Amino acid sequence: MRTIAILAAILLVALQAQAESLQERADEATTQKQSGEDNQDLAISFAGNGLSALRTSGSQARATCYCRIGHCTILESLSGVCEISGRLYRLCCR
């Protein structure tokens, strides 16, 4: 009886590990599928005085920001988080 209980416990642990692996793969697939949607991101532009060095020269800096599902592109930096319809996105600005 003990042997059956031990074998059942081992089987449950193996099934749980496999289920977690499948969930990670599903999450990765979802992330990859959504990364194609980055081109449809919401664009936000801010016009105003930029760095203090620019303020002294009288010019204005302009930032364009996107609410991205995936990571920011090479030219962008993570500037915060934005929320659209209760869902959180990365705020990436250049």
Curated annotation (Swiss-Prot):
Coiled-coil segments on the chain, per record: none
InterPro entries linked: Alpha-defensin, Alpha-defensin_C, Alpha-defensin_N, Beta/alpha-defensin_C
Gene Ontology terms, MF aspect: protein homodimerization activity
Localization per Swiss-Prot or TrEMBL: Secreted; Cytoplasmic vesicle, Secretory vesicle
GO cellular component: extracellular space; Golgi lumen; midbody; secretory granule; transport vesicle
Keywords: Antibiotic, Antimicrobial, Cytoplasmic vesicle, Defensin, Disulfide bond, Fungicide, Glycoprotein, Immunity, Innate immunity, Secreted, Signal
Signal peptide range: 1-19
PTM characteristics: Glycosylated. Proteolytically cleaved at Arg-62 by trypsin. Both the propeptide form proHD5/HD5(20-94) and HD5(56-94) are cleaved into the lumenal peptide form HD5(63-94) by trypsin. Unprocessed proHD5 exerts antimicrobial activities, but peptide potency is enhanced by peptide processing. Proteolytically cleaved in duodenal fluid; derived fragments are antimicrobially active against commensal bacteria (in vitro).
Disulfide bonds, paired cysteine numbers: C65-C93, C67-C82, C72-C92
PROSITE patterns, per database record: DEFENSIN
Keyword Glycoprotein: yes
Claim: Signal is one of the keywords in the record: yes
Superkingdom per UniProt: Eukaryota
An example Gene Ontology biological process: antimicrobial humoral immune response mediated by antimicrobial peptide
Family: Belongs to the alpha-defensin family.
Cited function: Host-defense peptide that maintains sterility in the urogenital system. Has antimicrobial activity against a wide range of bacteria, including Gram-negative E.coli, P.aeruginosa and S.typhimurium, and Gram-positive E.aerogenes, S.aureus, B.cereus, E.faecium and L.monocytogenes. Confers resistance to intestinal infection by S.typhimurium. Exhibits antimicrobial activity against enteric commensal bacteria such as B.adolescentis, L.acidophilus, B.breve, L.fermentum, B.longum and S.thermophilus. Binds to bacterial membranes and causes membrane disintegration.
Subunit structure: Homodimer. Homotetramer. Interacts with B.antracis lef/lethal factor.
Protein name, entry field: Defensin alpha 5
